[in-house]
């Protein structure tokens, strides 16, 4: 895949304008994660125990948004080194990853493939599907299936993980097909030899946590309401993330290799003045096109980097073509393109 002049120009310009913003600030990472986890667990506790419906719903909403934000740090873990935020990976797994049965290794070693230039948008990309070519019903199914994600991680942690330690073939299947946060169902993990010890530690931790909750529920120590509240909050967070996923790209590629320009223009920013995007696309995810341009840029510097690029790059720059005004506008555009492509397919003469 050859680079075009515009590919090189935009990348070089962006790197030149933001080279002083590439260092992660560990204090910001830790403070953000700690506050997010505190709000997540505190809101959950209130929602699961209060007798006030209004207070319970408000607390659940705050908990859901904080859970979503905390869980989104799994994306940052794939782009920062351990020495840039010492202990952060372990801290995240303790506060968020293991309790949600979504440990960091379900994304580490996977997301980086999405950034490999000759894999992006192809059938080898774990995070890409030609969604704009789906039928409207299939696209809606893709969105709403996310509500079942918590049940999936419970099944994986409570049943499949312990069984996999007894059945080697199941262990291999679990790691290759059921241990990655992906949207491409054909993706198969190939990094089985990496992080062997970490895999065991994270899987066993999720297994024991799930069994502890189930045992507490069976013994009456953990009320049913607590479990149902937790599942509802988790489900809504995964649904919101799936909605965000739908607007992270335009999803127009059908498996062919793309130039860097095509990859960038297939990606989407939802920048200010849209303030709501900080809630539904937290931890820098609202600058998704910028992230594909500069994958090493830490989330806390993305707003500043975006502002610099908007100011410095000319009106004819590709960079300005990557922005959408908001979530509903971008979703509406996707569903319009889906309907249009389906109509065009129906009108094509049969061969």
UniProtKB/Swiss-Prot annotation:
Annotated metabolic or biological route of this protein: Lipid metabolism; sphingolipid metabolism
Mutant lacking the gene: phenotype: Deletion of the gene leads to a ceramide molecule with a mass reduction of 16 Da corresponding to the loss of a hydroxyl group.
GO molecular function: oxidoreductase activity, acting on paired donors, with oxidation of a pair of donors resulting in the reduction of molecular oxygen to two molecules of water
Primary location: membrane
Pfam families associated with the record: FA_desaturase
Domain of life per record: Bacteria
One record GO biological process: sphingolipid metabolic process
Recorded topology in the membrane: Multi-pass membrane protein
Function: Involved in de novo bacterial ceramide synthesis.
Name of this chain's protein: Ceramide hydroxylase
Organism, as annotated: Caulobacter vibrioides (strain NA1000 / CB15N) (Caulobacter crescentus)
Name of the gene this protein is made from: cerH
